[in-house]
């Protein structure tokens, strides 16, 4: 019983630490960070004969530590979300859907803060506001992506490779099967059609009697079905020769090549984002 309790406590501890790593540190959507930064700056300084000096009051340092603690917690929250999303996505998709939008946010605020000479937090309130705004936008983007359906429908790289190999094996099995449908199709439908009803049949016996050709009848009509059977066989052979049995094979080969091309396009896209990552890092 004691062992069971220890195992249960250990399991709950692991679950709590796992979910705590992605839990919101505070409601940053409603945080009026500009007001807190201005208040911390005012409390940290006093006016002495028109000169701004640092205050000896501890209220300013307490307020500034509160602002810095929130910024650090929010930054850690962003890093945890980014790590979890990266573990669930393949490399190319993570770079395309997550890293590049984050790089745009970082570049924007890097451009806005480029002219500030004093880059000390709280000491320069305007610079601190831009840094806080950048971290909040980054957290909002990662949080929205983490909660979106795009992350729920992600397939791992192993499943993708397995699906590709299954499709290739199916194509190979289809190519190896003989095309039996061609022979069966023409064996059923290759018989000569019946004569139309509007045409009168020729009375061959009367014509032979008229021209005294009864003796030659046996010569021409020994096997009346032999010539028709030979013609039917020749017709079937001609039709089978005209039908290309490799059409199905070419169709499956074209389909396979198109899938390979798609797959090659995805690989080149990964190489493109790899080069972008090398430029930005």
From Swiss-Prot:
Subcellular location, in the record's words? Cell outer membrane
Span list, region Disordered: 162-281
Show the ranges annotated as biased composition (Basic and acidic residues).
250-262
Q: How does it sit in the bilayer?
A: Peripheral membrane protein
Q: Looking at the UniProt record for this protein, which Gene Ontology cellular component terms does it annotate, in alphabetical order? A: cell outer membrane
Q: Which domain of life is it from?
A: Bacteria
Q: Give residue spans, biased composition: Polar residues.
A: 179-196
Q: Where is the composition biased (Acidic residues)?
A: 219-249, 263-281
Which keywords are on file for this protein? Cell outer membrane, Membrane, Plasmid
**Taking the first listed entry, what is the main subcellular location of this protein, grouped into a coarse class?**
membrane
| Disulphide-bonded residues | none
Protein's name in the database = Putative outer membrane protein BBA52
What is the native source organism of this protein? Borreliella burgdorferi (strain ATCC 35210 / DSM 4680 / CIP 102532 / B31) (Borrelia burgdorferi)
Q: What lineage is on file?
A: Bacteria, Pseudomonadati, Spirochaetota, Spirochaetia, Spirochaetales
